[in-house]
Structure formats: C-alpha cells, structure tokens
Amino acid sequence: MADADTSSNSSKTNEDRSQEGFGTYQGYTDRVASEVQELARIISHASIQQLKLKRQHSRQESQKSNEQESELSGKLGVIPVDENGNFVDQRLNPNSPEFNAAYWIQNAHKLVSSDIDYFKPVTIGVAYKNLRAYGSASDADYQSTLVNLIPKYLSLFFREYILRHTGPTFDILKPMDGLIKPGELTVVLGRPGAGCSTFLKTIASQTYGYHIDKDSVIRYNSLTPHEIKKHYRGEVVYCAETENHFPQLTVGDTLEFAAKMRTPQNRPLGVSRDAYARHLAAVVMAVYGLSHTRNTKVGNDFIRGVSGGERKRVSIAEITLNNAMVQCWDNSTRGLDSATALEFIRALKASADIVHTTPLVAIYQCSQDAYDLFDKVVLMYQGYQIYFGSAKKAKQYFIDMGYECPQRQTTADFLTSLTNPAERIVRQGFEGKVPQTPQEFYEYWKKSPEGQQIVADVDQYLTEHSSAAEKEAIKEAHQARQSDHLKPASPYTVSFFMQVRYIAHRNILRIKGNPSIHLFQIFGNIGMSFILSSIFYNLPTATSSFYHRTAALFFAVLFNAFSCLLEIFSLYEARSIVEKHKKYALYHPAADAFASIVTELPTKFIIAIGFNLVYYFMVNFRRTPGNFFFYLLINFSATLAMSHIFRTIGAATKTLQEAMTPAAILLLALTIFTGFVIPTPNMHGWCRWINYLDPLAYAFESLIANEFHNRDFECSQYVPSGGSYPTAGPNRICTPVGSVPGQDFVDGTRYMEMSFDYRNSHKWRNFGIVIGFIVFFFCTYILLCEINKGAMQKGEILLFQQRALKKRKKANNDIESGEIEKVTPEFDNEYENNQDKMLQSGGDTFFWRDLTYQVKIKSEDRVILDHVSGWVKPGQVTALMGASGAGKTTLLNALSDRLTTGVVTEGIRLVNGRPLDSSFQRSIGYVQQQDLHLETSTVREALEFAAYLRQPKSVSRKEKNEYVDYIIRLLEMEQYADAVVGVSGEGLNVEQRKRLSIGVELVAKPKLLVFLDEPTSGLDSQTAWSICKLIRKLADNGQAILCTIHQPSAILLAEFDRLLFLQRGGQTVYFGDLGKNFTTLINYFEKYGAPKCPPEANPAEWMLEVIGAAPGSKANQDYYDVWLKSSEFQEMNSELDLMSEELVKKPLDDDPDRLKPYAAPYWEQYLFVTKRVFEQNWRTPSYLYSKFLLVVTSSLFNGFSFYKADRSLQGLQNQMFSVFMFLVILHTLIQQYLPTFVSQRDLYEVRERPSKTFSWITFIAAQVTAEIPWNIICGTLGYFCWYYPVGLYQNATYTNTVHQRGAFMWFAIVLFFIYTSTLAQLCISFLEIDDNAANLSVLLFTMCLAFCGVLVTKEQLPGFWVFMYRCSPFTYLVSVMLSVGLVDAPVTCAAKEYLRFSPPQGYTCMQYMEPYMKVAGGYLLNENSTTECEFCTMKVTNVFLKMIGSDYSKRGRDIGIYIAFIGINIIGTFILYWFARVPKNFDIKLRRKR
C-alpha cells in the first residue's frame, strides 16, 4: 500500500479521463480509481462482516464480550463505520458516488497509523559515517585468456596464501558521511562511473563482490548492516538499472507473485491473502499504467513481450509491492518518457510524505520539476562525495564556491556538470581559486560548515538511535507482518511452505508460458522408448536373450540418467532471478529449489509412465504385475536420485561451465560402475568403492533380480553341437555362465549370481538405499541453493588486455582506480576541422507513406503503426517522439527493414523515389536501444570489425583504421579504446557501451541515413548533450538522421530540426519543423485548440500533456483526427507527391558494387568472422578449460577404470565398452558448447545480420571452422589419456603395428570431437532455445549409440532397423576404433569363462571337440584330459570383431564414411539455419508485396 499512495499528489480531476489503460503511467485515471474502489469494497465489506460476526458471537458468549470488544477496537479500523456498520464519511464508501480514491488511500494510512497495536507501523532512516568501499585489483586487473589464466591465479594464490600479501586494492567510494531521515526523498547525482550504483548497493547492504572498510559505520535507526541482511532484508532493497524477470510470465502473474510474497499477516481482518495480493497488484499496475499489459508476457531482449519502458515499470512495480522502508533506485527512469519519469518521482515523494519511506534515487537526466521534489542530494565525483545536504541549497553552495550556473540549465544538470572539467564554468574573479580535482572538491566539502554540520548530525543520530527499545519496536513490527509458523528472526514475510506453494504456482505458469521444453521432453522420450524397445523387440525367454536383456535394463537406467543432466540448464536460467528475489526477501532460494522439484514431478512421472510402459512390454520383460510395477518404481526412483544429484552439482557451482564438467565425470563414473559395463566381480579394487556410492548400481541390481530370479531360460546354444554330437546328456553344456552340463535350461538366479554377483535378497534393500540417495541429495540440493551466493559481482571496473595493461602502467595511468577520468576535448580545433571531411555525407532523401503495420495477438490483429508518413532529408535531424509503447522503435524497425514478425499491410518506402534495393540495409546505420556487443572484444576491435566489413572494399585498411581512430576521438573514447567490452560490473559502464554502440554504426560510414533508438537513454545530461551535439555535427556534414528520444530537455530538443510525434496506436499527431524556440510546433497545437504552453515549460513534456499521454493529463480532443484534417497534413502530402516526382530524376550511382548486399566479399567476411570467433574462445578460458578438463578427466577415468584390460571374453567386452563409454561425453560437450553459440547468434541476429555486416553463410562457416582447432587439441588429450591406460596399444605388439594403429586411432578420436561440435551446431541451428537443442542432441546421441552395433549387432536387430545400423555414424567410428585396437591378438579366457563338461567314455577332449572346433573355433585348455574338458569359445580377437561387425580391412572405408557424416552435419546446419531462421524477414517481404 505504501506506493499505492503515490498518486495522492497527482491531479484529482482526471477520474473522467476517457483514454485509460495505455502504456504511460497515467496517475489517478478512472482505471486506478476503479481498482482502488474494488480493493476498498473488499476490505470494507470484510470489515463490516467481521464486525457483525463478532457482535453476533458476543451475544452468544456474553461472558467474553469485554475481551472481544477490546480485540475489535485494536484490530478493526480499516474503514471507519458506525455501530450499525454504516460509513461515517461517504467519500470512503466504495459504493457511494462520492467515493474518492486518493482520499481513501490517505485515510487508510491514517487509520493504519492510528491502530499501532495491530499494524505496528515503523519508519527507518539511514546514517553513514566514514563510509568507504574498496575492491581488490587482482579480481579483475586484466582479461583472462587460455594462456594467462593459470599463471594469473597461481600468482594470486602464491601472493595471498604463501607470501600472505593482501594485494593491491582500489577505492570505489572514498570516506563519506550522510544522514537520510524517514520521509526524506534523496537524489544521487553523478556521471556514469562516479560510484552512484556502488553507493546505493552499499546503502542496501548488497556488498557481495567488494569490501566495506572496517572503520565505516552504517546504521538503519539502531540496526547494523549485518542485522539488516540477516533479519530485515526486505525492508532495505536495491532496484538495479537492468530488468531481470522471467520472460515467459505475464506482467500480471509477475506482480501478483511479488504481492503474495509480501502480503502481511496483519492485513485488514476478513481479507484473504490471495484477494489482498491480487487487488493490490491490480492497483499498482493501474497506477503505473500497466493494466493493459496484464496478460502480456514480460519478455526480454530476445523474447517478444512488453516494450522496454513497460518492462522498466514492471521492475518499479515489483519494488513498490515489496513495501520496503528504504528503497535504493538505480537509474530507474531509464527508458521512461520525461512525463512518466516525473510522475514516478512524484510517486516516491508521496510515499515518503505519507508513509515515511526513505527513497534514494540515482538519476542521470533529471528535469527541474523532478529535482524540486527532492529533499536531499548526494553529489558523487569519481568515488568522492563532494556534497550532501539540502537539495534547495546545493546550487547556491557551488555558486558560492565560485562556479556559474548557465541560464536554462537545470539544477541537476548544473550539479552534474561540476564533475566534468570541460563543462563547468568558473565565475569571473574565481579563476585559480576554485577546486579542480575530485580530491580538492572533497577537501573543500569536508572543511565547509555544511560538511561539518553533517558530521555532527550523524554523530547525534547515532547517539539517539542506539537503544534496545528501538530495535525491539522494529522487531515487533516485522513479526506482526510475518505469517504463522515463521521464526521472528527470519527476513521473510510468508512461511516456507507458503513460499513453496506460491513458487510452484509460478513455475506452472512459466511452463504454461513456454511449454515447448516439457512437451519436447515428454514426446521425445516416449518416441525414444518406441525406438529403443524395438531394438530389443520381443526378446525370447531363452539364453540367447541374456546379453540383450541385461543391456536393455542397463539402457533404460542409462537413458533416464542422461535426461536428468539437462536440469542443470533450467537451474541456471532461473538463478539470477532467484538471487534478486532473495535480496528482496520474497522467498528462500531453498523454497524455489523445493518448488522446482515439485513442479517437475508431473513431467517426470508422465515420462516415466510413457517411456517405461512402452519399453517394458515391447522388450518382453517379465510379464507379471508385481514385476512390472517394481520395475517402474525402481526406474522412477533412480530418475529422482539422479535428478537430485545433478541439481546438487548445479547448486554447488557458480557458472554453467563449472557445473557441466563434474556432472559429466560423475555421469561417466556412475554409468561405468553400474554393473553392466564392468560386472561387479571384474571391477578393480581401487575403484570398487564407486560402485557402492552409485545409486544406479543399486537400481540395476534390483532390476536384474526382478527380471532373472526364479526363472528358467531355455538353452539356445550348446557346446559341442551339430553333426554327430549328442542332443542330450552330460557331454554337452549350454554356453552362458551359470549353466550346468546336461541341462537344457539355465537358472536365472544362478546366472545373475555368477555373472554379476547379485542377490535377490538385495532387491528391496536396494530400493531403500536409492530412497536414501534421494533424501540425502534432496537435502544437499536445498542446502546448497540456500547458501551458495552465485557469481560474485564486481565494482565498476574497466578491464584491459594484459599487453594493453602493461603499456598503460608504463604511461603511469591509474587503471586500478576503477574509473577513467573522462576529459571532454574541445571540438573547435584544427584537428577536428581537418577531420570533418572524413564524415560520410549523404545526398539521398528517404521517405515513406501510409506505413501500416499490425501483429496478431492471440486471435486479434492489433495495429501498431497506423498510416504513418514522413521523410528524412540530408542535413536534417528528425526527432521521433511519443509516449512509451507508441510504436517508435517499431517504426524504426519497419523503416530499416528489420521486422521479424507481423504484417506490413500498407505503405511504401522509397529512396529518391525508388524502391529499396538490396544494399539498403548496409547503407544505413541503426543504433539500437540495447547495447549488444561481443563481451570479449575490446572497444577498438569492435569498431575495426565493423569498419572492415561495412565500409566499401575500395577503402584501404589504413584508411579504415584512421577513420576508427577519428571516431574514437569524436566520441571521446580514447581513455578506454583498448578496454574490454566485458559484462556489467566488469567492463564498460552504461555510458561507455552506448558510445560504443553509436561508434559501431558511425565507423560503417552509412551513406544513406542513420537511425538512433534512444541514444541518450541511461546517460547523464552532459553525455546526452554531447551525443546530441555529435548528431548535430553529423547532420551538418550532410547526414540524414532519424532519432527517437525519451527524456529531452528543451536544450536537447533544440538541436533537432523536425519532429515526428506519435500517440499510442502508432498514430501521427504532428510531423513538421520545430521552429526557432519551438514556435512552429507550439503554434500548431495552440492553433488547433491546445492549452497555451507556459513560457518556462519543457515543450517535450507539454506535448505529452496536450495529447493526454502524460500521467494525470487528459486530451481535450483526438489529435490524430486533428492532424488528418489539418493544413499541415495536406502540405506534407503535397511535399511527398513532389518528392516522388522530382527525386526519381536524380541519376543513379554507377558504382558496380552498389547493389551488393554486403560491402566485403565473402572470403574476407569469413576470415574476419572466424578470427573473431576464435579470439572469443581464446578469451573465454572458462569454456576451453572446462572442455579440456572434461576430456582429460573423463578419458583418464575411463582408461583407468578399464586399466590394461586383458583379452579374456569379459576383457574384450570391457574394451568394447571402454570405447562405448568414451563416446558418452559427446552430449556433455554439446551442452558446454550450446550457450557460446547462442550468445554469438543472438548478437548476429539482433544487430549484425540486419545491418548486413556479414552473411549468415559466413556466420555458420566461421562457427564450424573456429571449433576445429580446439577439437584437435581435445582429440589429442583424449587419445593419450585413454588409449594407453586401457592398454589397446598392447594388442598391436603382436603384429608390430603399434605406431601405425596408434596414429589411426588418434585420427579417429580427433574426428569424433569434430563430429561432436558439428552435431551441436546442427541441433541448435534451427532451434531458439538451447534446452531444446540439448534434448534433441541427447535423442540423436542415444539413437547413434543404440544402433552402432555394441548393444545389439546388425544380425540381431529387427529387420526394420538394419537401415539405422547403417545410418548411425558411430557404427563406423566404433568399427574403426575396435578393429584398430583389437585386431590380430590372441584370446585367453578367464577361469570362470571356460565351459566345463565331460567327454564321452574313451575320448580325450581334443578328440571329442576337434570336429566342433574346426567349424566354431575356440581352444581347449586341457586337450588330453579324459575326465573334464575346459573349453574357451574364442581363440583370436578377430572372432570377437566379426561378431560385432568390425573389419580391420575396411577401416579406410569406415573412416571415410564417418568424415562424410561430419560433412552431412555441416551441410545440414546451413540448410536448417536458412530454413528456420533466415526466411523470417523474407516472409515479411513477401506478405508486404502481396
């Protein structure tokens, strides 16, 4: 309710407003009034009913009447009613025509404040003394690469843990003092990088990633930061500059969830939690103009949803619903139009005045009206606080210091300009006397009376607020808000299980918003069950099925385990949002973990039923109800155990790359030691313990016992047999282990005991052990989610490459300060004048007519642009303005040919009267609202990349480099030209990123025009002014520019020549000149009935008020109709007609390359893009080292698990499974690679493809090529770590081909890793979400493994599936690896593998077996024995190879076919990417033409 009060200062005359519910924050519209009225009705109705019930109850139990009246007087009081339940004041009656929403909210707060015994209202202020924040320079001193990462961290370890040196540090915030009392609204001013964000985070007690000096003191009343973080986290919150929400959720669902999590226990009596939260969220949505987006997805930069401004308001509304007492807002007006930004500040002011909250707001572009609302101001200058105190006195303080405030400059702009040496103006007579450096400003402030008074005030506050009683009051107020069954010390409002319930509901809504992943899993797994079970279809109840029956059980367990690995992806998708909500004290991360398990259970259960039902009966496992349900129970339990194990790994790590390697190693270990790949008796002693810790091993033993116990299997093959050998009697034996001479069947129990050392008595014991694993890892997962803090944030630190850092240190530049002092050079100098000629000048006129665009939302066609017309001429800057959601960005996308959805139903776009040609997109520059750049590149590299590929090939490399240098200087980026782009907090800040975005488009020398989408968003006023001056300079050099702008001051707007003004629905309300001092614009609106523009008003804000788009305003007419009927509209059409006729007469450019879609040839594109992708991998050592570590550890683990396997029958099978398990890491390698591909594809598709920087063919080719070197390294590492420990090289000693076969094996392994990356590229090429690509890769990988001939040979496959044997690439790879590794070596059976039987009377073993051995092979251990023959069924490894279809003589053919499969992957990647992702724009063009 706190911020629902915010509109109390808004206009109260707008309840009849006719246009409510649009995208701007509307203040108290009739929609807000209706939402508040409904909330009031519910609360008042509940209160009246509660009153009646209590009175009825008191009559029935008169002996308790006094107690009840006392309770009633204490707890009732939401709406004043008399003893009959009638309203005392009809303005508070929701059913009365006199109801007043603003008055109701104010009165509700008064009543809450008066009933302190029940509601226990408190206020919290903030005081800080000697506040200093610092970071460790070693955390981010230079960019890590593949080569320097290890030395870097070894050096750090040696310095900190061996030498015990603390290492260099840098100050982020210098010592400062301040006091903010409850009800005071404070603005934090400073240029980007001055330390404003760090200051707000520190006040909000969110200092993870940097340090606070031990001598610093921060107090919240009498509470310490430690107490705030531990017990009252939700009372002090920080709203980050960036938006971070679940994109699949709707706005309504997002905000209702936040409201539920902070719904107090001491709410008005009779009002349920859900009703309270639902209606409070509705009120806040209405207040912030979000009601119309209730059912719209929030979205993000890559998923379509609400507009950027609306998404910012969602973040604001979420904090509002948090109802925190201390609110730290970090540039929260970014992306809002000026009128909405002003109303947001008014809302915070009302909250501070009425509810006595303590808001702190960092704001970069602050109008005078907004500044006048603030009580106090904090001015930051490179980490120094150079002023703190009254906002009204700040201006005079600096004037008295000796600085001059120019006319028309707002106070906030004046204060911020003081931190820029090039902007501040010294008053006459004060030259040389005023402070110049940050340190001098700081010292002046410390010595000033104002500074000394602040120190005294802080000391007094700390003394006054140190009592235990005050702490106890805050504790009681917090406890009153908490739900039942919650510890008073908990920072949360609702209990743990209520949190789980609400989060589970939210997760269901997320699944509903994007069901593709779960549907893909369900139908993919069920489909795979049909495929896999058909491989083992209808196994006979005979000994010939022993291997396949156990293999089928193993594969069932293995497949379920593989699918669980993907859950790590979804865990990391939600982690940043969960961490944010933890900081808001909405819920425990453990509650989210619990709820995620609960909401995944239905999907898991459906998959378990679907997969196992099909699989069990198609394979023909034991068909009795008890056995089936036990099989289902064990498989489902094993799935849950593996799910919790992998979730535990995800929760224990901080990045996805960190998680994938241990997860893959663990999966490999659990798979190898399940008991099938290496039977329990054959495991080496040193690794036998792994089997004991393997939940799959216990599940597998139970499944084997379930299938084999007390079951006889008919013998399929006898030794000896055929010819004249007897068909019965003791002189023959069945071939499987566990057979008895003379018996025609094998006892299943004996078979499993002798082969696997399994016991049926362990069946239910093992189930209990699996349950134990489930419970244990469930607890570890929950615990780790709660205590793992995630990746550490950094202070705002510029990051340089190591070589650049050395150069800077030689130049004595202090890069460790974390900030670079930005000196703005003067442009009117000789250098600039000489370089002006370098700016590309236009000459072509671009115009459009009746442009209409609509999208389908559900079943409704919504018009986004409605017959918009206009033009952009060389030398002119046209401003595109309108409220948030008016269609400004959509118009830019439509004009620049960047729409990817929807239909352009009408309209034309012409250049010089001619239709757009194929070179249009590369002939324009488009500075997008999102600053998307490759995070591993430096600023200079990003600019050079754009220049090389977008400037004509006729321009030399030297000229391109010179132009890049010029743009760097033009945009004042010299100080960080060699800095790494990085990520937020460790790299460029917001301002620097925006400058880079503009620079990337300028270095392309767009010859036609430049589009800029909110280029000043997120910048301080001085930087915004310099950007506008730059835009003006470009236009003066002949460039045509169309620029959207959200929060222009009058000074900024004056730099523009023309204005295209849109209202919601994409309707034009004005297109024309601005005129000197905006006279043309103002006269137009006043001529057609608009109220007079006050002389001191900002025309931008006045226009929004005129058309009814400003909060609390109402249009007196439909200005779209006014425009259509105006003479200006007719003049515009006449001008368009004239341009259509005259401009087409201009001669065409005779450049032969003019119509080419790309400036650079394909080969040059390929070289540059491949180099960039390779460099990105090189500079992302976490990816490469994770990849290498996975290969090395898995290969070593595999190699030593099968260490020097012998050539017994089981040994040969072990070596075969060692090859099989070597391939298992494929899907983990794919999952490691997918995020890197997606991040590069997002950058390409959002920015580089629309600008025609390079072709999609180049993009795919570069991705394929850049991975090959790393795959060769992986293959080499895998070869040495696996081939020699397994001992395959020993098999080649018998033929003296150790080196030849070793080299061939290396080549095959390298090809395997190349195949892995190409398969990953094939899977992700046409899919949007990497989770789905990972699922698809698992399915393809499973099929490749299943049909490669290891589990089931070609001869044993059902006839239908033989084609899959030939289509599986692993068929040929396994054939090569096994034949090269095993061919031409002798076989020696283990003791238990010999078949023992007696020869007939009078025969030696050799005499009896010789005819059989000539046909079937094998050898006798005791040829001359007449009592017992010991027969081994195999003599040389070639027999084993023939059984599995591997032929050494065909190794060349097989390796060639495998290479062909790699080629198929690559070709398929090109085709699928073109089919699924390239045609989007093409489809729109076709529909537009039709």
From Swiss-Prot:
Superkingdom, taxonomy of origin: Eukaryota
Limits of the ABC transporter domain: 151-407, 846-1090
TM segment ranges: 517-537, 551-571, 601-621, 626-646, 659-679, 767-787, 1183-1203, 1217-1237, 1268-1288, 1304-1324, 1333-1353, 1370-1390, 1455-1475
Pfam family, one: ABC2_membrane
GO-annotated biological processes: xenobiotic detoxification by transmembrane export across the plasma membrane
Record key words, sorted: ATP-binding, Glycoprotein, Membrane, Nucleotide-binding, Repeat, Transmembrane, Transmembrane helix, Transport
Compositionally biased spans, kind Basic and acidic residues: 58-67
Extent of Polar residues compositional bias: 1-12
Record's bilayer topology term: Multi-pass membrane protein
Cytoplasmic side: 1-516, 788-1182
Main location (coarse class): membrane
GO molecular function: ABC-type transporter activity; ATP binding; ATP hydrolysis activity
Family classification: Belongs to the ABC transporter superfamily. ABCG family. PDR (TC 3.A.1.205) subfamily.
Protein name: ABC transporter CDR4
Organism: Candida albicans
Lineage start: Eukaryota, Fungi, Dikarya, Ascomycota, Saccharomycotina
